[in-house]
Structure formats: structure tokens, C-alpha cells
């Protein structure tokens, strides 16, 4: 089991997702899988990120609802969650 860490921005992103009416159980299921150290099912389209997010991973909760996280040893840091436009806007 990994030790979870939550960024301040992640906590704000969760509140925004709730306001948008997202199904928070989907997010909770994904977080539980990651904290417990399970390999994610292919449906999450989990993959490493590049550029400014190098070292982080991205998993799809829904087609346009993402989770950005980083695994370091026995800890996992949940950095951001939101739409592509929220997370990767230039």
C-alpha cells in the first residue's frame, strides 16, 4: 500500500469536479486502485507524461476527466484532476 499525498491544487480540482456534477465514486475507485498498488485496467488509458509534466502519469477517469499523479517509492502524490483544457491549457 502506498502513502497518499494530495496537492493543494488537487483538493481545489476535486471541489470543482464536484461542482461540475462529476461522479466522485469514479475518482475514489481510481485513487483506491493506485494507493493499493494495483495495475490499472486498460480502460484508464494510463500513460507517462512529457514536457513540463515529465515524471508524472495521467489516467483517464472519463474521456475528458483526467488524474495526474506521481509514484515515488512507497508514496503516491495526486497532483491534479480535471478536463484536458483545465490541465494542459497553454
Give the predicted meaning of each segment.
Residues 1-3, 9, 19-25, 60-66, ...:
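Enriched for short, Lys/Arg-rich terminal
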Residues 24-27, 46:
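A general structural signal for well-ordered alpha-helical segments in protein cores
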Residues 33-61:
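A short, surface-exposed loop/turn module that caps and links secondary-structure elements
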Amino acid at each position: 500500500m502506498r502513502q497518499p499525498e494530495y496537492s493543494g491544487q488537487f483538493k481545489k480540482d476535486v471541489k470543482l469536479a464536484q461542482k461540475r456534477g462529476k461522479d466522485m465514486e469514479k475518482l475514489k475507485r481510481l485513487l483506491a486502485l493506485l494507493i493499493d498498488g494495483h495495475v490499472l485496467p486498460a480502460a484508464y488509458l494510463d500513460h507517462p507524461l512529457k514536457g513540463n509534466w515529465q515524471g508524472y502519469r495521467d489516467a483517464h477517469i472519463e474521456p475528458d476527466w483526467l488524474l495526474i499523479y506521481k509514484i515515488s517509492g512507497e508514496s503516491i502524490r495526486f497532483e491534479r484532476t480535471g478536463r484536458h483544457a483545465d490541465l494542459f491549457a497553454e
